[in-house]
């Protein structure tokens, strides 16, 4: 351990002012320093001074300086300080828990001499030494002190051991004395231990020895029994002075001694068992150390000095940071401090046995400490500061720790589970188990306190997968073992350990009651289960149901509610309990009934007052009633009678409540008079016994107290007179007779004649008793009494009276007995028969009336049958000779043997119908032979067959059937029966039936249908062995589809289809299976291929490991290369077989070469070290440059071969010069010579020979001469030469043939020259026919080499005009072709023109085509999309052509959405009245009125263009055949609409015309057949709203919203037209295909309409005019008169009409003047344009005084 100076707590003074004593509190939070001026300073753990107080003298008269403080110590709870003073007193000050609390003296102990030292080792016990040598004990609880031991020598030092249970005192004479309060089993001696050479002022008691030092400057370490262990002698050190004080670390592993300017540190070495001195802490000017105090956690040491200074030191062996979250400070080998860096909390971990702490871990969500020493294990909970140390032998660090339980650490090691409770130094217990899963272990440690049970510690765990053991951890014995039929996968005890829940793998939830050892299954399909914390309420989930057991004692009573997700947890807090359920992506909380939970908890805890208080808050329901009943029962058992009274009141049990109330009053009175609870008073106990209906116990309690009267009163109150009289008799009570009389009188008064009769009978008065019995209507009792007394039988009148009463009461048997007794057999027999007493009747008849016996036997049998006593009736029927009845009775009684016996005695007809019933019984007993015999006797053979069939006895059934049925009927029967068996799932039986009738195919089909493939295969193999293989294959495919792979494998392999098996496993990723099958069934190399594919699927090192494991690595690399998987091959070789890499590179290069990737192949060849292969590759592909480059760079020896190869290629291309150069570079002139010879180029051959191989020249010349003679020619030159020779010889025909044979692809000039020469010779010298043939051959050949003019000239020489023209056409020499046609044969002029057009078309030369064929050119423009050029060109043509292409362009634009450009076309070129164009005009109109952004002044020109085009169209229609047609009228209407739109846009540009614009928007509504209705109503509503016409706006917006809804729904059926009745706004309008108003604007309208509707300030009616109709309607509904619309507003003109020249055109004068005035004031050009159009449309304007100049 090392000391590091931290801070100065108290600065030293200039002179002597020593610190007399210091002390740290037990909780490490406070540090006290007592100075020379007797003031106690209090510091916090960080060294900040927080408080102080002054000590006081024993007697103030001596003054404050009359004493010194010699000892000071904190109490174990850190709230008090004991101060030992030299004025013979000890004060105990209560300083409180908080700083600043008032300091009060709570104890004082006056002594006989000065207190010299003081310790406070344990609660209430202060130990102190006195100057007179005594060591005494002060008890703060009793406020008394006593002497522990006494010596004659001044006590100079006092210390305690680490546990505080032993004290050590040092005395002035050197004596050191030891005393134990508890030696803790150490066996160490007490008393004088050692005599030190000097007074041991510095005395410390460490773990393993005692260290003492003093003025002799020697430090001595003594053993446990006082022998010297070590001595440290500093007497010869001139720097050292006397040792004044010592302190041992809290762990006892270190000791610090103080002297002058120095602190000496000694550390105990456990390994060497000696003290080792550390480097001393020397501080100049510290002066003498007078006091030392070590913080309880060992982390700080404080030293007080002679000059009044206090220095604080940090003490540690080492420090480390754990996971950047915790600081571990080792203050000693066996002690360390764990500090949480984030929260600052600290825990002191210490080995109580002094073992060195070796390893510290913080586990379990950083809450739990685990540390090892050599022999122990340290555990701790950082949150609760509960620490444990248990013996633990090292197990190699293989322990597994589980921290799921907050009270217990579970340690699993080598199959053994050890439980350690935090804060306990003993393990709770150990058990053997292999199942270390927190869900399979449940520990409950005092989790809920119960009445009468202080400790409750239980464990449940798995012994094996199906056996649960429950252990009581306190006693260490087994309290329950549960053996279950299936594997357990979860278990948990409840908090009290009385119930165990567990769930098995079948998701069945079971509850086990430990006390009764009963197991109950409470839920199926349980996916979640948990006890509610703090209660015995259980929550579980079953599929979509949440199940809650509020009372687990009644597991059948479960509260269920439906949920839609999965339960994920429980949360309890804030007075409620919630079950958290995930529903999709959200979590929903289901709240439980907190009241029911609370009640159960209160009951379990025995807190019945709390349970009552809770129940009083609930309404009375069946569940609440059950809880009240439970509480009443428990309260009675616990003798809590007031609670029980309240329960019965709540339950409405008034009598019990009242009875308990009276009982409580008795108990309370007794309690007040005699003390105690009062429930033990005998009256209270008796009344409780009465409440439980245990009257004998109550009687016994009364009689024990000799309270006979009270017992009798009890019985009388209960009307139990018999017991009352019995008590009176037993106790000889004087009122016995009176009781009896009173009882009899009471019986008579209450008409209890029977009881009175019994009383009289018991007293011997028979007649009176009979009279009372008869009066009570009990003649049977009277008869019984008469029959027992002969004297009463003699009374005939009495007997008659009784028999009459008996017969009247239908007690015939008793009457018969009486008649028989008085010898009247006839009446007796009648009575017996009436009373069904046939036994007595028959016995009487046998004696008195024998003839009646048979009749009576039959009647007796009938009676027994009625009584269902059929068995007894059989013999009676036999006696009565009633065979049929006997048979029926035997059958009914199931007396089958008797029935057979009786049947065998009957004739066949009678018996036949009964045999089958008996046979059915024997068939059910499987006694088939007897049953068959009976069926046969009963002529029911078919039933016998069915019996055998159902029993599976097909052979017997078939044998029997063949005897009595046709074979085909047998087949039908068996197949039908087999189908029934199949339906019942009895497939084997069905199979036997099918096979029996030789229909195995039906059985095969059945097995296939039900997927019983083994049986199917068995039958196929037996009956169709030729189809067995195909069947296996088919089944394999089916099973593979179903995912039943192992079964599929079997069938594939049986079908010899191992490849299918392998592919199946491969596709499912089951490579091991695929490999196994391939290796077992696939021949020598199949498994290698599978292994390769497997490895490829893994890739990387995994593939290498696999292949190495299988021993197929090299084979796999070869296989990868063979299959062109070079990347995989490279990967494998790189990872494992690097020597294979060049080979793979070579194979990869060859692959790339085959693929034509030569550059990549070149690189791979070079990487493979095979550059020559790359050269050969390039040579093979005649890439000479690359070949030469590679050869020169990587293989110089191949350069010559490359040049030779290149030369060979040049020769093949007839490039002899190049070939020659290459061969000469390769220094191979001989080869060049041979090539020239082979090519017949003898002149070049001779030249080469002469220049490079002159030695062979002569031989070459001779060879040339021989070759020339042999061939007569030398190639092309030879042909030309030969031709010339023939020409010179006059053989022109042969010369022509030779010229025609010339073919030299390298010289087209030579060929042309030769062919022209041939033609020239043929024309000049050969006959015309021959010359024609030659020209026809030469002409095409010349054309073929591009000599079209020469070919044409040849043709013209022979007047072949068409061929000449074709030659010019093919050569694209059109002018020459035209000239030839024109001059030589005009018939071909059109021919040339047609080809020229085709040529221009094909070449796209439209500009040139225009001059030839304008329509074709225009079509070509259209095809090319050059519309502007097309229209421009068409403009130059006639009107019809122009408008054809205008229409085409307009159609194109409209399709592209460019209606505006289409409109502009017709503005520019006019709108002809072609019916073909009508759809275009309509489409432009529709697109324009549907387009957004047109309801503004800026859109005027667009509307004006539309208006002008439509006006132009209508003007053209008037002049056409379409005048006045429906189309004409429609376009007139469109013109009017366009005019309204244009006028509206114009009006929108001028503020004063806004009402005109609004009216135009409203007028447009009458044209909604042609306009999008939603847009029109929206614009009308908007306009009306802007000018303040809110009624109209409201109605129009309503209509607009209805229309938008109709568009969404796709139908107008739901529209309400009531607002537009009697208007000309149409109801039937086209449904717009889409919304024309954006969503935002629709929402604005919706909000406005809703606001107005809420205000209710508008009437939902349209404004009316003087006609009484809607003001914008042209038609008056009442008269049908139609008004003209105003040209300016569209509204009807009712007066002040201005008429125009054109009929039907007029304007309202006011609107007209308003419009003119606006134009005059604004000079608006658009409004002027409107007037201009009206003038043009209506034939001029009316006379007006306004001028626009």
Swiss-Prot record:
TPR repeats lie at residues 593-624, 692-725, 809-842, 854-887, 912-945, 947-970, 971-1004, 1042-1075, 1142-1175, 1276-1309, 1345-1378, 1411-1445, 1447-1477, 1574-1607. Keywords: Acetylation, Cell projection, Cilium, Developmental protein, Isopeptide bond, Methylation, Nucleus, Repeat, TPR repeat, Ubl conjugation, WD repeat. There is a cross-link at residue 4 (Glycyl lysine isopeptide (Lys-Gly) (interchain with G-Cter in SUMO1)). Interacts with IFT88. Interacts with IFT57. Interacts with RABL2/RABL2A; binds preferentially to GDP-bound RABL2. May interact with LHX3 and LHX4; the relevance of such interaction is however unclear in vivo. This is Intraflagellar transport protein 172 homolog. Required for the maintenance and formation of cilia. Plays an indirect role in hedgehog (Hh) signaling, cilia being required for all activity of the hedgehog pathway. Pfam families: TPR_IF140-IFT172, TPR_IFT80_172, WD40. It comes from Rattus norvegicus. Highly expressed in the testis and pituitary cells. Its main location: other. It is found in: Cell projection, Cilium; Nucleus. The keyword Repeat applies. PANTHER family: IFT140/172-RELATED, INTRAFLAGELLAR TRANSPORT PROTEIN 172 HOMOLOG. Belongs to the IFT172 family. The modification Omega-N-methylarginine is found at residue 672. The keyword Acetylation applies.
